């Protein structure tokens, strides 16, 4: 009974967290949820070999529904990924080969799996791939059975497409224009196969979702619903989920757990409590209490550490979180003895600036090559002023030449200038 109670309030709970951008027929959906568990889906197109932070809110939304007793379907678009969604994109997407897309499908399925429970009885999650129904469909079937239900007049008036059509330098190909039909049919297909009654997605998907609702009604005479989550923005107007190095990925080989943890630690005070509502499963009351505590403590806020810990654990597990915190602590304290070889690999991947050097190099040259100083002369002064450490140990001899003891695990040396400027030397 508790599950159903939570479920009937689910839309309200999501709204309290700021997680609802648009919803079709909210009262009817709330009533449907109150009657008992439903199946719902969210689609993830393989446009790269990993999901990124932008995918996390809808993915966690699937998890929220499952926790309330509903059955989530994670659809990876093996077919739609071959076409490319034009929604609010300034230019035509590059088409990827079928082999590449199928490889990416496998990786993304694996990435989605830990967030959902695929073995919990009646509301066990399902993984689906729309290539299963589009792969063998011929063009005549597509045009007759799907195309005849779509009005071109309505399609070109959808905001996502209209923006492209209004650009003089960019039109839209028939390939991308037809994407709306494919995603619409996904909904109708999942409704028939698994009784899916709700699609969730980012607010840029509204046009595709409403097409699917309309098509499902026409093909199966079933009422289904759509709900979108907001696209995440930052208070300062800059794009969320990007760093100087590009997107923040969920794949630890593309964004290390340390870098991922640091991304959240650096969240602005103006964003952090909102992000706790979006990206964690903490109660609203708990988040509000934390905000109040931070406001009155007179110290640096604790919220960023709570956020970083919660989201890193969600995405990278306890092991990833422990490593990220260990690296953070060691860099802060300057004592590197607790770092493992795997920790150094994370730092080399994207944690701190990295430079490769030949054995026999001296400290002055290392500071220049690492861009910690502009010239050997400047490097000499900095070293002499006791402002440089090698693996956490001060070194004030400008003529210092690195030796084997400086090469941790035979390969790594961490330089620091001042308090915060790091560079990792990887010896060739």
Curated annotation (Swiss-Prot):
Gene3D superfamilies in alphabetical order: HUPs, RNA-binding S4 domain, Tyrosyl-Transfer RNA Synthetase
Annotated motif 'HIGH' region, positions: 46-55
Transmembrane feature ranges: none
Binding site for L-tyrosine: 41, 179, 183
InterPro entries in alphabetical order: aa-tRNA-synth_I_CS (IPR001412), aa-tRNA-synth_Ic (IPR002305), Rossmann-like_a/b/a_fold (IPR014729), S4_RNA-bd (IPR002942), S4_RNA-bd_sf (IPR036986), SYY-like_C (IPR054608), Tyr-tRNA-ligase (IPR002307), Tyr-tRNA-ligase_bac-type (IPR024088)
Keyword annotations of the record: Aminoacyl-tRNA synthetase, ATP-binding, Cytoplasm, Ligase, Nucleotide-binding, Protein biosynthesis, RNA-binding
Any Pfam family: tRNA-synt_1b
The protein's name in its UniProt record: Tyrosine--tRNA ligase
Natural source organism: Salmonella paratyphi C (strain RKS4594)
Gene that this sequence comes from: tyrS
């Amino acid at each position: 009974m508790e599950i159903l109670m939570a479920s009937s309030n689910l839309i309200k709970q999501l709204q309290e967290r700021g997680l609802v951008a648009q919803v079709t027929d909210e009262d009817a959906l709330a009533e449907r949820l109150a009657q008992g568990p439903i199946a719902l889906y969210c689609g993830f197109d393989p446009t790269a070999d990993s999901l990124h932070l932008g995918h996390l809110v809808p993915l966690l939304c699937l998890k929220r529904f499952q926790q309330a007793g509903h059955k989530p379907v994670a659809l990876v678009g093996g077919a739609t990924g071959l076409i490319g969604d034009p929604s609010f994109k300034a230019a035509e997407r590059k088409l990827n080969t079928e082999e590449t897309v199928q490889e990416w499908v496998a990786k993304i399925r694996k990435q989605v799996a830990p967030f959902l429970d695929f073995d919990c009885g009646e509301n066990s999650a399902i993984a689906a791939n729309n290539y299963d129904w589009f792969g063998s469909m011929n063009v005549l079937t597509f045009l007759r059975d799907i195309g005849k239900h779509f009005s071109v007049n309505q399609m070109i008036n959808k905001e996502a497409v209209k923006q492209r059509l209004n650009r003089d330098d960019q039109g839209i190909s028939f390939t991308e224009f037809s994407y709306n039909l494919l995603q619409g049919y996904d909904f109708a297909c999942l409704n028939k196969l698994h009784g899916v009654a709700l699609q969730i997605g980012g607010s840029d998907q509204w046009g595709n979702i409403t097409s699917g609702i309309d098509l499902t009604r026409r093909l199966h005479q079933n009422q289904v619903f759509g709900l979108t989550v907001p696209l995440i923005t930052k208070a300062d107007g800059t794009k969320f989920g990007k760093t100087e190095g590009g997107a923040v990925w969920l794949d630890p080989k593309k964004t290390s757990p340390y870098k991922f943890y640091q991304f959240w630690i650096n969240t602005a005070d103006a964003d952090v409590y909102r992000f706790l509502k979006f990206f964690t499963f903490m109660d609203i009351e708990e988040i509000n209490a934390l905000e109040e505590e931070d406001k009155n403590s007179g110290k640096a806020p604790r919220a960023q550490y709570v956020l970083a810990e919660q989201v890193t654990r969600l995405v990278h597990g306890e092991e990833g979180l422990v490593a990220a915190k260990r690296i953070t602590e060691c860099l802060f304290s300057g004592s590197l003895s607790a770092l493992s070889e795997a920790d150094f690999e994370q730092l080399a991947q994207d944690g701190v600036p990295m430079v490769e050097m030949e054995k026999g190099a001296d400290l002055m040259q290392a500071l220049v090559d690492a861009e910690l100083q502009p010239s050997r002369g400047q490097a000499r002064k900095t070293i002499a002023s006791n402002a440089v450490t090698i693996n956490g140990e001060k070194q004030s001899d400008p003529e210092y030449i690195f030796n084997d003891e400086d090469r941790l695990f035979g390969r790594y040396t961490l330089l620091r200038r001042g308090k915060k400027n790091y560079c990792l030397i990887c010896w060739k």
